[in-house]
């Protein structure tokens, strides 16, 4: 999904902007950095319970924590990493609002991606490092230093 498709999916959900944060690939997609296959959200417990009661399919994450799924959207109470945790309150307070949607900040997203170690996360870390260097005004270099 490109940024417009992700935004359309999120707008259709009509979630309270102060109760969730877009994380993962969808946060990159909305910023126009790459496409994504799904939309991961971290939400406050009251919204999680409301969506669960509304019939969202329950799932269990690799760390044993509960999640919800409907279509392309997956809902969590936290991120799937113990070593780089952030509370939902912290995520909401530090979210970057784009197109009316709260996105995880790039530094936090990069920290999570570094802990996962999957091939797609390694590619995302390289992308995020370039974007953050550019944002800081530093010269852009490839991962091999050129």
Which functions belong to the PLM regions below?
Residues 1-146:
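Compositionally biased terminal segments of proteins
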